[in-house]
Amino acid sequence: MSRLLTVIPVYNGEHFLEATLESVASQTHRPDRVIIQDNCSTDGTRSIALAYKKKGFEWLLNDEYLPSLDNFNAAMRFAEETDVLHLLTADDLIHPDFYARLLEPLEKVEGRALVYSAYEVIDEDGTLVEGGDLVSPFPILPEG
């Protein structure tokens, strides 16, 4: 079974972070490790993240504020520590069987793979606005 690491880059995410973390905590197949990478938030993000330590989540605070894309790219440093890295934005929710469905086809892939999934857009009330349901792996072929 592949090791799964989820990294959640966040900056001032207090309005959505708890719902995102709860969607990870309630997975049918939990990640082996979940890191909340806080980009020096100035709102209630820290207290929400620390409350999830008892559920096994880790909170890491950046040394300094990074532009959003740089914070996201900094999360990529964890790729070498795991078989599967999932970068989850702090305002996204995942279906309860997301990781189970994500990992199943990856078990058949040798070497590296890139996986993407379709998405559903919901409004602030949780009403579906648009989207679909898909998880699909594409192997990255070695050069030569």
PLM features: what roles do these ranges have?
Residues 1-144:
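Nucleotide-sugar donor-binding/catalytic module of glycosyltransferases
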